[in-house]
Amino acid sequence: MKRWHQVVAAMLLASTAVYAQAGREQQQGGGGQAQAGRGGQGRGGGQGRGGGQVVSTADLTVLDGWGRPLTNPLAGGKTPGPAPARDISGMWEPANGPGAGIQANGPVSMPSDGKREPPYTPAGKASYDSHKALYGYRATLPSLSNDPRNHCDPLGFPRANFYQLRHTKIIQLENQVVILYQFDKRYRVIWTDGRDFPAELPDNRWYGYSVGRWVDDATFVVNTIGLIGNERVWLDETGRPMSDQMKVEERFHRVNSHLMELTVTVEDPKFYTKPWVPMDKFPMKLQAPDYDIIEMLCAPSDMESYSTDFGDPASGIKR
């Protein structure tokens, strides 16, 4: 356990150094830039929303999850090519580095900052007020939180997009798209054979029932229903609620050969008065095909040790 923490700490330090160097190169005018976030100007032109400015790492050494150097596909001044038609396959990560996908204080386009909140119904507001989250402007002490994930319950969906969205492998098969997530080694199956949703779902699922379609050669739209909610799953780290009536739409838009934008819209008539957008054009970059990610799992025994050694003392709880 101690060794694992040392490895993660070393990786975080290395990642910080890499992106700090990228920032210095950007200030000195080195390297091209793609702009996919709210505000700021990039040399690549164009503006989007919700993801922040994309930092160029074209001339930096690329490391995989184990610190192994890889061949950087954009090294030596190479520029991204056009988006391949109807293809979002590959290994993707947040374009501004793994930390951009953590989203501890809420989804990137609706953070919990005390200034704005989603459009709750009375039932949604009551559910939200009953949640004691570890993050956000109403954060509580560790051992006082009632977040289901504190017991290593599955994050569920769409929270999988709103917390620890790190390296993501997308595999396109004949009749389905499979998405593999680094955090908790989760996977989702999205049917692409033209089927509709079942007339009746026998059971709701942690990650729901998903069907996908191409709306144009660069945009893949996924709709998901049949989700577990009602206090077993939260929408995000800050305690926003979701019910089993939630519907989710994801739009994966391939900007070019090496950049993709993810937009997520949620609709839940039980807890929200209208649909809203937690993630708007969140930029993700394509990684090297031989990128080997490091394992990240929530182990109940580790969570128990954390509570005993750190969470309880920090919360003033004596056992």
Regions found by a protein language model. Give the residues of each.
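Bacterial N-terminal signal peptides that target proteins for export
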Residues: 1-8
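N-terminal signal peptide c-region/cleavage motif recognized by signal peptidases
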Residues: 15-17
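PEST-like low-complexity, intrinsically disordered acidic/proline/serine-rich tracts
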Residues: 19-319
